[in-house]
């Protein structure tokens, strides 16, 4: 009896233990499920909160990448203790490696941008990213930002072009991520030829070029695709935000900048001209830009091919953005910066990789090819600004010149007058000449009793070679001057046509005295109004192509 009782107690004890274990296991499953639900609710609340404070939520859309071990991919190339974090990539790799590939970044767009709507049938694009020995953390963050922050139907593929990196797996392992493809060069080709290779195999009708150390912002792609859909000859770029090379902070860039350059073909960011600012009432509207930075832009593939792709005889990197920008404008297209598109970029202070002929010689070769094909007689100013280019080899440009002729592209003079009139043509020793309209010439007419300098038109006396002193003018550095006195508009407002033009003592910093030539017009640089003759005075008026009173001849003393 005791034995039976002992066995019964043992059985009951085991049953109790098993029952307790089963209960706890089931409870744990339910708890995990409910935690997942609450987590989703928290994520939903977090995403709403982040949207309110204009931060992109850290949410990965779609299914996880099958077969891609993100942790293993990143840990294989992390810095060793004591290594210089800047040495290999010219940015702080240690800080980059600390960050999640899916990190949230701030929405830096203008508050009006979220209310802009776009077509529901925007074309899909092939995103082309070229790289050479890029840090795995920045490369992966670039790829994942595109996938996480772009509607899936707009990304046909992401083509990674590995420009002969030391480790092929930097690229190959990423093909385990959906939509990512990898092309590997069997020798170092450089960004330019690598991009052409990526474009040639791209399946989409629209190409999007990205650098390999970027993070795209929310709704970055639809605004650019919309502009290209409306006009396939547009080449569009986002506002390029700054990712700190030191701590990888994401910093908003100004929305009032466009691309510019000097005669040495050195790219610079510059303020939008004042007259354009004054007419911009909608901050979401595109900004015309003379050149693009070149690292990030969207272009129709057929237009890219029609224009001749890139100049494949250019080496590695540098200068290709000028060549493409001149070609787009002069051959019938346009360049825009779209304010509602934002992409962050790590700007480095040095190149982390080697150029076969050195950085300086490579840049000279590339920009010299640009100058010889596209700058016509103005290439002399390139050589004056960059004398080290004189005599340097740059290869044959015969096929590029022939292609320009076949496309019936406009002149560089047209580009300066219609696209980039702010680029001043250098004047070494500006000699006096006359400013003529019909048989009359612009002349100073002494002073009145109040001491004001008088200005008017009079019958031309003498010649351009030997003008009368009152009709001899010097037009240089945006000033129209005579013996220390300069033409000045009395108003710089575009809304004030008919304002008199007077003579006053020259002040190179005075905006009222700034003028530029635009074809046969003399245009006030600030107001955008044109110099016009009236019966009793000279005024600034709205420029009109058929206004004879606004047509001028500037005949230099030669």
UniProtKB/Swiss-Prot annotation:
It is a single-pass type II membrane protein. One of its GO terms (cellular component) is Golgi apparatus. Its cofactor is Mn(2+). Keywords: Disulfide bond, Glycosyltransferase, Golgi apparatus, Lectin, Manganese, Membrane, Metal-binding, Signal-anchor, Transferase, Transmembrane, Transmembrane helix. Mn(2+) binds at residues 211, 213, 345. Pathway: Protein modification; protein glycosylation. Residues 122-227 are annotated as: Catalytic subdomain A. InterPro entries: GalNAc-T, Glyco_trans_2-like, Nucleotide-diphossugar_trans, Ricin_B-like_lectins, Ricin_B_lectin. Substrate binds at residues 163, 188, 212, 317, 348, 351, 353. PROSITE patterns: RICIN_B_LECTIN. Disulfide bonds join 113-340, 331-409, 441-460, 486-506, 530-543. The keyword Metal-binding applies. It holds the Pfam family Glycos_transf_2. Residues 33-54 are annotated as: Disordered. Residues 45-54 have a biased composition (Basic and acidic residues). Residues 27-558 are lumenal. Residues 428-555 form the Ricin B-type lectin domain. GO terms for biological process: protein O-linked glycosylation; protein O-linked glycosylation via serine; protein O-linked glycosylation via threonine. SUPFAM superfamilies: Nucleotide-diphospho-sugar transferases, Ricin B-like lectins. It catalyses: L-seryl-[protein] + UDP-N-acetyl-alpha-D-galactosamine = a 3-O-[N-acetyl-alpha-D-galactosaminyl]-L-seryl-[protein] + UDP + H(+); L-threonyl-[protein] + UDP-N-acetyl-alpha-D-galactosamine = a 3-O-[N-acetyl-alpha-D-galactosaminyl]-L-threonyl-[protein] + UDP + H(+). One of its GO terms (molecular function) is polypeptide N-acetylgalactosaminyltransferase activity. There are two conserved domains in the glycosyltransferase region: the N-terminal domain (domain A, also called GT1 motif), which is probably involved in manganese coordination and substrate binding and the C-terminal domain (domain B, also called Gal/GalNAc-T motif), which is probably involved in catalytic reaction and UDP-Gal binding. Catalyzes the initial reaction in O-linked oligosaccharide biosynthesis, the transfer of an N-acetyl-D-galactosamine residue to a serine or threonine residue on the protein receptor. This is Polypeptide N-acetylgalactosaminyltransferase 16. The lineage of its organism: Eukaryota, Metazoa, Chordata, Craniata, Vertebrata. The gene is GALNT16.
